[in-house]
Amino acid sequence: MTEVYIDSTVKALQQLHQTTLRTDKRTVRIVEFLGLQAESIVEAHKAGNSAVCFHLCCWCKQLIGKSREEVMNGELNLAMAQQTIASEHGYKDWNAVEAQGNVQLDLPFENCIDAMLAGDLNELSETLATTPALIRQQSQYGHRATLLHYLGANGVESYRQVTPLNAVQIAECLIEAGADVNSLANIYGGSKPLGLLTTSAHPANAGVTEAVAAVLENAGAT
C-alpha cells in the first residue's frame, strides 16, 4: 500500500466529516452532500472542535484572517457555514449550489480521484484505460478541477488535500493518459496544475514538489 502524506489539520477534517464522507455517493445530490458538511461545521464549532478553523479561516468571508481563538469564540450560523463550503468548492455563494438542483456527484470521476489520492496506481491506470474521458473531465463542483488539479492538493476540498508519496508516478500516469497540463480550474480566480502544486504546503511537506513539477514542466506545463 502506498504511503500518503496527510497533514494533521486535514486528518482532523476527515474525522470531522467522516459520517458525511460515508454517504452513498450513488444517490446523493451535490446540494445535499455539501449541506451535510455545512451542518457538521456548525455542530463542531458549537462543540469546541477547532478543526473547523481550517475551513473558516480560509473560506468564511467574515472570518478569513482571524485567529483560531477569535474564530472559536465568535458566532457561526448555518448560513455562514454554507457560504464557507460553497466558496471552498468554487461556488460564488450557496445560491449557486442550490441552483444545481438535482445534480448528483459523478461516481466514476469521484472514485478516480479517491484512487489517485490513495496512490493506487494500478486502479487509476485501469480506470483511465477503461474510461479515457475521465482524464479531461472536470469536477461537477464549482471549482471545475481535473484529476491533475487535485494532485496539487490546493484549493480543492479540504479533506482531499493530501499527497501520495508516489505522486511522480501518478503525474506520469495522468499525462500519459492525455491530461491537459495547462487546464484552467476555477480556483483562486483561475489556476493551472503547476501553480497549484508549487504553492501548496502538502506536496512540499511530502517532499515531492520539485520532482512532480519537473514532470509537469517536461510535458509543457506553465
Report residues per predicted region:
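Amphipathic alpha-helical interaction segments
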Residues: 80-84, 146, 169, 192
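Ankyrin-repeat boundary/"N-cap" motif
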Residues: 105-116, 136-161, 183-203
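Intrinsically disordered, low-complexity eukaryotic regions enriched in glycine, serine
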Residues: 2-130, 143, 161-163, 182, ...
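Ankyrin repeat domain, specifically the short helix-to-loop turn at the C-terminus of the second helix
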Residues: 126-134, 168-180, 213-222
